[in-house]
């Protein structure tokens, strides 16, 4: 079998102008970035707002193994399969961060014969969105430091600046730094740090904004620091929201590319799901819904993280809610949740599949709490055995959830036809009755408790002394009714990455909160979740090169 990049490089791409005609996008509606990439114009985005809204399919997964379970691959393959069976379909995905691409994951544009192309461009610099977000974020940092240097009219307490710089790389050495050293002309010395770009609040804002006006308002509402009276200092106090919006003027426009099978794809925005809300942009998803009859989108990591945030944070900003949720499962992940060591996951173990099924069952039941029909997609791997597949299908039938085997990685659109037909049948026969997990009027504390109890299966929530003090502050500042974005390990329902399966009887500890008032939510930090990852011992970058002709080598 060829590698992902070899498959991608063997495909003869069609001009993006030809691809987008399938969904009624004309040459004048796009801004070209070469022959195979484009951005959608504001004029077209506004024009289609009066169009009927199509069906929305959310793809999520069980708690993953470190290698991931193929959500992006399944999303792409499902969209291709829907087109193959005659359904006018678009896909709306996140764009990858360069940090994980160079670090542990390699490329992140699908895999095998279910990829979005040109994958090298998408994985590297694409249309420059990540750089624009990085620049806007760091421009704000520079403007804060300049404000301190020029007299500090707002009385910002330099010990309580919460805005960090960012970089779209994994670089643990930058987690904690001191800026302003050297002499008085170099600024006011203070502690600072770097997050990865996809953890920036500006990334979350870009992905939730509905237009430039909304983007500017959200940027103005960012809290960057506290003054000497411990009152919040906003971007609007610095009067720089206009400049930040200008930097992001083009980045907010969704990017258009294609799959191997020519399905039009909107790839835009990429917040992580363990430290942010983990969904592609509202603009991309909303626009796809008005251009196609079916839109397939995904939410990062397992359904306890990305899907919960999609349903509780993103959906209120969309013109519709999901008509179906597809939960991706792999036999290797189920065996891991059933107690099998990572080194033995390729060996047949039917009993481990039975034991690990508890993880899948909880995710299915969690999605049903939102009133949305669920379909299970088994992402097929070479090491899967007939006995393991049979027992998984039997277990799914026992909880009355439709299940289909999909081999889109190996067989492309054809490998997803059965799944596509089942998803369409479920959408046509079962009407979704979406409801959020919590109400707007619930306090931050109540929202956290509902997520922990109803989604994670935990017993109780423990709040640190710092978190308790912050809750009092939030009530004072009027932030106590904002949605909650949980920052938690992706490997477990709990805050302990080693507690696999479907654990119960555990508590979740909230060590602190981070207000993201521009994005419109409060981040609750659990465990040791890092906002700036480090590189592994053998980074994926060690396998990468470029030929003398300029061809990418080893990019997954």
Curated annotation (Swiss-Prot):
The record, for InterPro entries, names: Formate_THF_ligase (IPR000559), Formate_THF_ligase_CS (IPR020628), P-loop_NTPase (IPR027417)
Residues binding ATP are 65-72
Q: Does the keyword ATP-binding apply?
A: yes
Catalysis performed (reactions): (6S)-5,6,7,8-tetrahydrofolate + formate + ATP = (6R)-10-formyltetrahydrofolate + ADP + phosphate
TM annotation in the entry: none
- Please name the HAMAP family in this protein's record: FTHFS
Q: What is the name attached to this protein's record?
A: Formate--tetrahydrofolate ligase
Q: What is the species listed in this Swiss-Prot or TrEMBL entry?
A: Streptococcus uberis (strain ATCC BAA-854 / 0140J)
Upper taxonomic lineage: Bacteria, Bacillati, Bacillota, Bacilli, Lactobacillales
């Amino acid at each position: 079998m060829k590698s992902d990049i070899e498959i991608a490089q063997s495909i003869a791409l069609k001009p993006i102008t030809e691809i987008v005609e399938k969904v009624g996008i004309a040459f004048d509606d796009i801004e070209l970035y070469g022959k195979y990439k484009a951005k959608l114009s504001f004029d077209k985005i506004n024009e289609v707002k009066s169009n009927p809204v199509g069906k929305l399919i959310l793809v999520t997964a069980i708690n993953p193994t470190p290698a991931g379970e193929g959500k992006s691959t399944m999303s792409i393959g499902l969209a291709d399969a829907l087109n193959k069976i005659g359904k006018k379909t678009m896909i709306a995905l996140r764009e990858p961060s360069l940090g994980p691409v160079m670090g542990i994951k390699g490329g992140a544009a699908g895999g095998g014969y279910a990829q979005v192309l040109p994958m090298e461009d998408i994985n590297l610099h694409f249309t420059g969105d990540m750089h624009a977000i990085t620049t806007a974020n760091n421009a704000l940092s520079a403007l804060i430091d300049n404000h301190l240097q020029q007299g500090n009219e707002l009385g910002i307490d330099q010990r309580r600046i919460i805005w960090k710089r960012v970089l779209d790389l994994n670089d643990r050495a930058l987690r904690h730094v001191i800026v302003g050293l050297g002499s008085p002309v170099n600024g006011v010395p203070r502690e600072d740090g770097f997050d990865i770009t996809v953890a920036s609040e500006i990334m979350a804002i870009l992905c939730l904004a509905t237009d430039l006006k909304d983007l500017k308002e959200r940027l103005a509402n960012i809290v960057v620091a506290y003054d000497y009276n411990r009152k919040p200092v906003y971007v609007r106090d610095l009067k720089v929201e206009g400049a930040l919006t200008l930097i992001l003027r083009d980045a907010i426009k969704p990017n258009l590319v294609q799959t191997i099978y020519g399905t039009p794809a909107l790839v835009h925005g990429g917040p992580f799901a363990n430290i942010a809300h983990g969904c592609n942009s509202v603009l991309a998803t909303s626009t796809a819904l008005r251009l196609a009859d079916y839109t397939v989108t995904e939410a990062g990591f397992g359904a306890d993280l990305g899907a919960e945030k999609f349903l509780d944070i993103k959906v209120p900003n969309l013109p519709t809610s999901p008509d179906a949720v597809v939960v991706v499962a792999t036999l290797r992940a189920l065996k891991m949740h059933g107690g099998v060591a990572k080194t033995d996951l390729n060996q047949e173990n039917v009993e481990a599949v039975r034991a690990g099924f508890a993880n899948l069952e909880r995710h299915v039941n969690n999605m049903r709490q939102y009133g949305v029909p669920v379909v299970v997609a088994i992402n097929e791997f070479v090491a899967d055995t007939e006995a393991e597949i049979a027992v998984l299908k039997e277990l799914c039938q026992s909880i009355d959830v439709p299940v289909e085997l999909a081999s889109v990685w190996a067989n492309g659109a054809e490998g997803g036809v059965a799944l596509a037909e089942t998803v369409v049948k479920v959408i046509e026969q079962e009407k979704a009755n979406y409801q959020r997990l919590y109400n707007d009027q619930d306090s931050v504390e109540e929202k956290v408790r509902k997520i922990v109890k109803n989604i994670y299966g935990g017993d109780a929530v423990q709040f640190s002394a710092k978190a308790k003090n912050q809750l009092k502050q939030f009530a004072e500042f009027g932030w106590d009714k904002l949605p909650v974005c949980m920052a938690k390990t992706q490997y477990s329902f709990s805050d302990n990455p080693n507690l696999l399966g479907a654990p119960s009887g555990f508590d979740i500890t909230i060590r602190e909160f981070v207000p993201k008032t521009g994005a419109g939510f409060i981040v609750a930090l659990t465990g040791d979740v890092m906002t700036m990852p480090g590189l592994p011992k053998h980074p994926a970058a060690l396998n990468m090169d470029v030929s003398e002709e300029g061809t990418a080598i080893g990019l997954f």
